[in-house]
Amino acid sequence: MFVAMSRFTVGNDMTAEVKEAFRNRPHLVDQAPGFQRLDVISPADNPDEIWLITYWSDENSFTIWHRSHKFREVHKWIPKGLKVVSKSVKLRPFHHVCS
């Protein structure tokens, strides 16, 4: 299993709108080959920080999705006016060891 974790911090007063957008997301990634699940989490001590954790059957499936047109399309539903703290955006790949 391959896991991709991405993080960003909301830089304006739109944290509630961003979280609501994730709750109502269009689920486009759900049909991607190899996709298993998406978790959206936020640290208790920093609610403006958003972590996206996607689980994939393999790294190649993630890479294909990440380079796809649909990946870019998914970002169209992000609330208009959202400002992200510069240098807060990070994507890290992981290999799942065990559960």
Over which residues does each language-model region extend?
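Glycine-rich beta-strand-turn "strand-cap" elements at beta-sheet edges
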Residues: 2, 39-48, 76-99
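Short, well-ordered beta-strand segments in beta-rich or mixed alpha/beta enzyme
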Residues: 3-8, 39-68
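Short, surface-exposed ligand-recognition loops at beta-strand->loop->(often short) alpha-helix junctions
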Residues: 9-18
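Intrinsically disordered, low-complexity segments enriched in polar/charged residues with Gly/Pro
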Residues: 14-15, 26-28, 40-42
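Hydrophobic alpha-helical membrane-association signature
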Residues: 21-22
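An amphipathic, aromatic/His-enriched active-site/gating alpha helix that lines ligand/cofactor pockets
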Residues: 27-33, 55-89
